[in-house]
């Protein structure tokens, strides 16, 4: 039986996804706690309309809006940017190390000098060092944007539910729904960004080492899109603007887990 290919860091993708999931679950927990403390009094158990709830304050709408502003501030404090950046940095260092180990294996296979191909972007190689910094900033921004979208959408959901007479159950469903949507977004980020980072690190190392061509390799499972199944095993030039998937290297198309094998 042929040995299963291991050119894509699936475990690192899943680790990245799990870490983002943990962040999102913290957001969900914070949301539920805030709702119980600051907004619970404005809703009923779901059997009465809004004007039956305990909100005798004639300025209840303004009070809710003020509470939702406070919600934004509270959520911003759930994790600071350094926490997110630290997570992203750990992920990217791991992807880089995976790429580095692959490069060393190719070095042994073809007999090239290890120093030529085994470049570490965190150890003084200017081009890769700059790429690393940019990728960390990009992914930190992606997670922060995902968080802000989660907060903004929940504020709208909660206000509309209260305004339309929704009960606790309705708001609980809204929180769960938004959390589920955000978890799926995290899955997309982990998959897409892992493939892109690996692709670009591998391509730079390979071309720096003198390789001009690569073989497109897929994961050879049921998730591989038909187009990439057809590309699997075919040879392309790194500098061909129409090669690969319309000029994109393996791993660069959205949600692509394919990888390049330099030859």
Task: Annotate each PLM feature.
Residues 1-181:
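N-terminal leader/targeting and assembly helices and adjacent pre-domain segments
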Residues 177-181, 185-263:
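Acidic, glycine-rich two-metal-ion catalytic cores of nucleic acid-processing enzymes
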